[in-house]
Design a protein with these regions (language model features):
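Iron-sulfur cluster-binding electron-transfer modules in prokaryotic oxidoreductases
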Residues: 1-213
Length: 213
């Protein structure tokens, strides 16, 4: 059954079960980290957008007193590069590792589940934390071999899907008998799903499903 709840809804559900109060920045639907513009060379627009987001996050986090959870690793990677060091910025995997694993009682899945470590997760040095989160949620985590960058390349996977297909040419045979896959970037997950035969979603869904009731 395809998941009906959005990543935001699931994230709030998990955070509240861990005892957190969730605060959203004002005008959140108008905010953007600027990555889509930066990737196309529109650096002034990218910096203007990230500046707006930075201001809103500083206000919402009480000048960095509270940690900030972002929903994808590429956005978080840019934000860490260009925003104030006052902000404690996390993508899902590191936030789960640092702030949720010790607050939630998890029941490991007995199924073999696939995991994809995104390029920006690697750049941020999150491989070990990714593996720790995976092992906390399933007895049989699978990190496919010879699958590095997924080739979605920001939004190029929408317009040049052949790049994505070539980058993931070794994926399907390794995961098509598995029940699901998990990562921390929605565009990567779209390409992974399209080229693997299984559905990839955010690791936050996996944690939600692993919480003991």
């Amino acid at each position: 059954v395809r998941e009906k709840k959005s990543l935001v809804e699931v994230s709030v559900e998990v955070l509240e079960k861990a005892g957190y109060e969730v605060i959203f920045p004002e005008s959140k639907n108008k905010l953007c980290c600027g990555t889509p513009w930066e990737s196309k060379g529109f650096f002034d627009i990218a910096d203007a957008k990230s500046g707006e987001l930075e201001e809103a996050l500083l206000q919402a986090s009480k000048q960095g007193e509270y940690p900030v959870l972002c929903d994808t690793s590429p956005c978080t990677h840019r934000m860490k590069r260009v925003m104030s060091e006052k902000l404690k910025l996390y993508e899902p995997v590191e936030f789960i590792h640092d702030h949720l694993l010790d607050k939630l009682e998890l029941q490991k899945s007995r199924e073999s589940l696939a995991f994809h470590i995104t390029c920006t997760s690697t750049k941020m040095g999150l491989e070990e934390k990714f593996m720790t989160v995976a092992r906390a949620c399933t007895e049989q985590p699978v990190f496919p071999e010879e699958v590095g960058c997924c080739g979605f390349a920001g939004d190029k996977g929408f317009t040049q899907p052949e790049i994505n297909t070539w980058a993931l040419r070794n994926l399907k045979l390794q995961v098509d008998r598995l029940s699901a896959g998990y990562s921390n970037s929605r565009t990567c997950e779209i390409g992974l799903s399209r080229n693997s035969g299984i559905d990839y979603t955010s690791v936050m869904y996996l944690v939600r499903d692993a919480i003991k009731e």
